[in-house]
Amino acid sequence: MPQVDPDLFDRGQFQAELALKASPIAAFKKAIRRARDVLDNRFRSGRDIRRLIEDRAWFVDNILQQAWDQFEWSEDADIALLAVGGYGRGELHPYSDIDLLILLESDDHEVFREPIERFLTLLWDIGLEVGQSVRSVDECAQEGRADLTVITNLMESRTIAGPEHLRQRMLEVTSTQHMWPSKEFFLAKHAEQKKRHHKYNDTEYNLEPNVKGSPGGLRDIQTILWVARRQYGTLNLHALAGEGFLLGSENALLASSQEFLWKVRYALHMLAGRSEDRLLFDYQVRIAGLLGYEDNDAKLAIERFMQKYYRVVMSIAELSDLIIQHFEEVILSDDDGTPQPINSRFQLHDGYIEATNPNVFRRTPFAMLEIFVLMAQHPEIKGVRADTIRLLREHRHLINDDFRNDIRNTSLFIELFKCEIGIHRNLRRMNRYGILGLYLPEFGHIVGQMQHDLFHIYTVDAHTLNLIKHLRKLQYTEVSEKFPLASKIMARLPKPELIYLAGLYHDIGKGRGGDHSELGAVDAQAFGTRHHLPAWDNRLIVWLVSNHLVMSTTAQRKDLSDPQVIHDFAQFVGDEVHLDYLYVLTVADINATNPTLWNSWRASLLRQLYTETKRALRRGLENPVDREEQIRRTQTAALDILVRSGTDPDDVEQLWSALGDDYFLRHTAGDVAWHSDAILQQPADGGPLVLIKETTQREFEGGTQIFIYAPDQHDFFAVTVAAMDQLNLNIHDARIITSSSQFTLDTYIVLDHEGGSIGNNPERIQDIRDGLTEALRNPDDYPTIIKRRVPRQLKHFAFAPQVTIHNDAQRPVTVLELLAPDRPGLLARIGKIFLEFDLSLQNAKIATLGERVEDVFFITDANNQPLSDPQLCSQLQEAIVKQLSVNSEPGGDLRISI
């Protein structure tokens, strides 16, 4: 800490100002404001961050000493003011906790009660937010023995004012001889760390990470130092290196990583104007700018900054694992035991694998891959011994092109993917220890690569490893219940290693600019060649990487009731083997991207596409189902259901004669029978008919189907979606049919706000039925579009809406594709615009992906014809962009082809 820094705090000048004022508060506040400005300017000008946080601690020391001196304490008073915790370490960020301990010799606090209260009141009056405790030396011992947090704080203390001997006595009575011996302390701190990591999903890669508490954050470094302090009396990283527990390179890496996180935390506090350790979207862009990051052709400044952040915390996590493992071996091991040989290079020691000698990786570099294969083959191995982790770090520079092309290494890498268990766990270890990104440089490129959106909640490497984890979990019984079809297919794949390898490469082309699927396919081709994969295997992997988005896009954006869509997709996949692999990869990809993306309706769409495509492949691509055949088959099956329930076939025929072909193409026989039975029983003046049921009885799949039958009216769709918005229903699919008798038969698939169907909830179902019926009885009383607050996170991903309009080549409709920021009530607003433009909606595919929506609307004009006026299309686009540009960028993108 500085001894003198008059620009930050001039003691003489401050005391002179105190003497001129009746109250000291103004002088203190002025000094605090000035110091904050000085320190912020120093930060912006690039001052060394370690000096900066020490400067702030030094300034607060001086302020506290001056405040302490405002009160009369006798020279021999047994009372002292101590800094504890982070402040005790001499580290203070702009709004860090200022933790104080007022330490007394005696348990009797009464004699000092009044001056202590006045001292603390002064601190609050001058704007210092302090956390304080008042304890005697004996009370410190009692509290420290009972509370891990208290003993941790007391270990880091400095005397600010008063006699030093009180602190020394406190340290003596709270030492390991009296409480918290190093073994007990280590176990408690390690458990505390695991609990903290679990709070942040056990990943360094959260979208809005906590720079202090997340895995790889500042708290992990502090945990290392706390354990070292309790075991060895070591004060800092440099001292820990001096004791031989850290190599010089490891110390340098931890120190530089700590300083980077200090910069981020300092900037966070400065921008937030409060204690804020969450790297929220609100601050990420500005911090990237403060730290000097700029956009380039391939990446935004924020993506470059966050990639640096993720790589830093990954390095900290790696070293933290190593050091904690070392502490565990030293502190907890009661008996070294006799190592059990695995082979000439590795042995098992206390359940952990270790190299048999320090030269293993130098003499046999292939052992750097072999160790992970051995752990996959022997799941009883708990992990890697600390010294062997260190040896891996020291020798990983040997991974070069010769290493990558060595047949022993390529064979070992493929062997890992053929292991029945442990693939994900050991790929994650390889990534943690820096081996995976060196062996596959293309993977190294995506380590820490974020995507600035809410759709992808993990970095590319974390998402990739999560995908492999999901593939592996499909073989677990508890997971197979949620994903029955994917689990069944996964179990019968002829070569499961190929799906794992495709998963490893599916997003590897991201962050370079260009189409990541095409770039990844090139890398996958090179990988297969280098690893001597059979030609068919390699072609399948490359095909999967190149086309890994196609099935998801088809299911969510195409009309799966159209036989031509199924036929085209069946032609695309070509055979059932490709279909099986692509389906499983798609399911795992969606779940590994963002758990909230996988909902029951997406599950149903993918199952439907898979099942219909499989049926088409078995029938033969040369024998596609035509429209007439599908209509005839649906009508025959539906009529059979109705007749068996006692319905008059003549009544059915009369009803169906007005419905048109599209109705029977877009509904199942079961739904047609359900609709027809209810319509035929509906009184002539019964008002709107609203039917509600689940689309499937399969758990974890489907949605809630709402069928509405009523006389057609101009504003029917707009009124319906506005009413559903009021009912807090998320629309995921809309099928709009108008009969020749001018009745509308609309089917909506809805989910609740948690992504599930309404289920067996009679009260909720009745509320929905009543709400829709009332709205449709009084269409002129247009439901108010609820003005809901746009969620905080969505505000930071605004972009200009994009509208594409073109006429369908096969059907007499106009296709309007919308890509826009998500916002509450979006579909209700679109419905109102369609009403204003006198447009009819024939069909809709609704998809919300993170912070954006990708919706497709099939529309016609007032005469049920495709749009033909370019000027009308332009006006429609402008209206949509204007309506949806609130809280997003102005402008918009229009593409019209009519």
Swiss-Prot record:
UniProt cross-references to PANTHER family, sorted A to Z: BIFUNCTIONAL URIDYLYLTRANSFERASE/URIDYLYL-REMOVING ENZYME, BIFUNCTIONAL URIDYLYLTRANSFERASE_URIDYLYL-REMOVING ENZYME
Stated name of the protein: Bifunctional uridylyltransferase/uridylyl-removing enzyme
GO molecular function list: [protein-PII] uridylyltransferase activity; phosphoric diester hydrolase activity
Matches recorded under InterPro entries: ACT-like_dom_sf, ACT_dom, HD/PDEase_dom, HD_domain, NT_sf, PII_UdlTrfase/GS_AdlTrfase, Polymerase_NTP_transf_dom, UTase/UR
Similarity comment: Belongs to the GlnD family.
Catalytic activity reported: [protein-PII]-L-tyrosine + UTP = [protein-PII]-uridylyl-L-tyrosine + diphosphate; [protein-PII]-uridylyl-L-tyrosine + H2O = [protein-PII]-L-tyrosine + UMP + H(+)
Organism, as annotated: Pseudomonas syringae pv. tomato (strain ATCC BAA-871 / DC3000)
Domain topic, free-text comment: Has four distinct domains: an N-terminal nucleotidyltransferase (NT) domain responsible for UTase activity, a central HD domain that encodes UR activity, and two C-terminal ACT domains that seem to have a role in glutamine sensing.
Domain ACT: 705-788, 815-891
Taxonomic classification: Bacteria, Pseudomonadati, Pseudomonadota, Gammaproteobacteria, Pseudomonadales
